[in-house]
Amino acid sequence: MNQTIKAKLELLPDSPGCYLHKDKNGTVIYVGKAKNLKNRVRSYFHGSHNTKTELLVSEIEDLEWIVVGSNIESLVLEINLIQRYKPKYNIMLKDDKYYPFLKITNEKYPRLLVVRKVQKDGATYFGPYPDVKAANEVKRLLDRIFPFRKCGLHEKKVCFYFHIHQCLCPVVNHVDPQVFKDMTQEVKEFLTGSDKKIVNELEAKMMVSSDNMEFEQAAEYRDVIKAIGTLRTKQRVMNQDLKDRDVFGYYVDKGWMCVQVFFVRQGKLIQRDVNMFPYYNDAEEDFLTYIGQFYQDNNHMMPREIFIPQDIDKESVEAVVAASQEGNLLTKAQAKEVDAKVFTAKTLKFSDQKDVEQSIVKLDKELSAEKRLSSLLAKTQIVQPSRGEKKQLVNMATKNAQSQLQLKFDVAERDILKTTKAVENLGKILGIPKPVRIESFDNSNIMGTSPVSAMVVFIDGKPSKKDYRKYKIKTVVGADDYASMREVMTRRYSRALKEETALPDLIAMDGGAGQVNITKQVLKELGLSIPVAGMQKNDKHQTSELLFGDPLDVVPLSRQSQEFFLLTRIQDEVHRFAITFHRQLRGKNTFSSKLDGIVGLGPKRKQKLLTTFKNLKAIEEASVQEVAEADIPYEVAERVKTTLSGPIQENENWESLKDNVPLLEGKK
């Protein structure tokens, strides 16, 4: 805990509000709410915590807080702040999970579509459906009954669907728009279970067609009636009142929460939504946050009723639902004001003369959620069933949440057992003690520029990211992989000896005999005896074989074994870590070329120079005419020569310049 945090902990009020934890870069990494800010925030820095919370606390370098008037206000504000800052330790709903809906467009001559997103466009939506197949099945049936527009608005003749009675071609046939309004209402009635009227009409039409000996048309009506019956059978009716409901259940265990949502539409259970995540707050409070985020997503349509368990505060759920129905938890103006208040707090001075930002901020009264409840809750009711079928629905959601969470733990436990066994077996195969700690190294550079190396550490078969290390190559010029590895191994294990830090049980090099032998030489020079293996790749850059022993030999390992999978994970991870570091370093090392800023010399003409000359010195030594022959206008060539007449920067080379020239369209 640093001095800034210590000072701020003394300022914490006994009020409800929200707090924001930040990392060393000032990035918000966690947003929480509390009935008592002083007690809640201080609890992070005192006492013992589980592993997840300890990881969060280890990254906290600063904190802010916002004081509000009530617990409900803090709940509403917390959800807004999470959506705004997207902290990595908060619950974040998956944004790639869109269920399909049926949509009747808000047009003069509307269309019937299957879509994945609900928008505020005045259209009529039905759903969600469990998958696209189910939505399309309903749409195909509706198309056979209700001939919504399928053609364009500028057609001059009827379309194909007109001939099969699935489109009225309203533009060509000048259909009254009221016809479509009536059809839309009939679709609403049909999808809410009132299909008896439609079936009766179809049966009457079937009889008329049969009497008129129009047997094909009669068969079509018969098939549609049969399809309606089939669809009705597939959808189990959960409640006879046919209301749209979302049923929530949750379960917590071992620091994890699972939330199950059952979608009940027209009394039928059609789908469920499952989310599992670690929670750092009180379980009930994190569940409330989840509900708020759930309905802030426009893809989740607000139902007529929301069922929640008995142990959840109904008033708080009403607050977040009301805020979501309103469209935004805060208006843009209010959100900007919150930002200004959080990050423009007053400064206090303490006895140690250190300035510490005072972060007690009052939220304006207009954010009060209670004032909005009466009008907004008329649309959606929050229900806590106490008996009967409705109570059974909530219990079923809760039991499913428990089952899913237990399944996650069972799978994770099996994976741990497999990984632990793989580590033990790897030691037996190599004839060494169990390699609890494995360190792996890899180099990365392009044409010798920005050479780096990286080390990853696996403990008991799992990555220990706090032990990862990055190395900038200091003593090697150009692309010398072996010399770079010698430098890194010397630096790593000299320091380990000096500081008496943990040494690995096995070093797994990303490479073959060359890298292994260099590592062995360095270890011998340092007086260390650590087993070294080489993870060799094939021409497809995939883990191919394990080299070990003296002399080195290929260790027979099945590609389907857990030991081989472990080595593959280690090799992939060290390669990823090294190349990511290299890209970061290259980005920092970019510079402005002497060719930048020359009037008339844009990216395309720089590319032409790049393909004609090897380096800047070659351009400098060329004549104006030779530069112009590279398809550069003569006056621009003159400016190039004039600019390059000065000394070339020492660190400027053509490979670096090449990185700064955008590729021409179509070139690779």
UniProtKB/Swiss-Prot annotation:
User: What keywords were assigned to this record?
Assistant: Cytoplasm, DNA damage, DNA excision, DNA repair, Excision nuclease, SOS response
Its function, per the record, reads: The UvrABC repair system catalyzes the recognition and processing of DNA lesions. UvrC both incises the 5' and 3' sides of the lesion. The N-terminal half is responsible for the 3' incision and the C-terminal half is responsible for the 5' incision.
Database matches in CDD domains: GIY-YIG_UvrC_Cho
GO terms for CC? cytoplasm; excinuclease repair complex
**Family note:** Belongs to the UvrC family.
Q: Which Gene3D superfamilies match?
A: 5' to 3' exonuclease, C-terminal subdomain, GIY-YIG endonuclease, UVR domain, UvrC, RNAse H endonuclease domain
Stored NCBIfam families = uvrC
Which coarse location class describes where this protein primarily resides? cytoplasm
Q: Lineage in the entry?
A: Bacteria, Bacillati, Bacillota, Bacilli, Lactobacillales
User: One GO molecular function term?
Assistant: DNA binding
Q: Where in the cell is it found?
A: Cytoplasm
Gene from which this protein is expressed: uvrC
Q: Where is the UVR domain?
A: 196-231
Taking every annotated instance into account, which residue ranges of this chain make up the domain GIY-YIG? 14-91
The GO biological-process annotations, alphabetized, read as: nucleotide-excision repair; SOS response
Which HAMAP family does this one have? UvrC
| The organism of origin for this protein | Lactococcus lactis subsp. lactis (strain IL1403)
Lineage, top-rank taxon, reads: Bacteria
* Quaternary assembly: Interacts with UvrB in an incision complex.
Span-the-membrane segments of this chain are: none
Stored PROSITE patterns: GIY_YIG (PS50164), UVR (PS50151), UVRC (PS50165)
Q: What is this protein called?
A: UvrABC system protein C
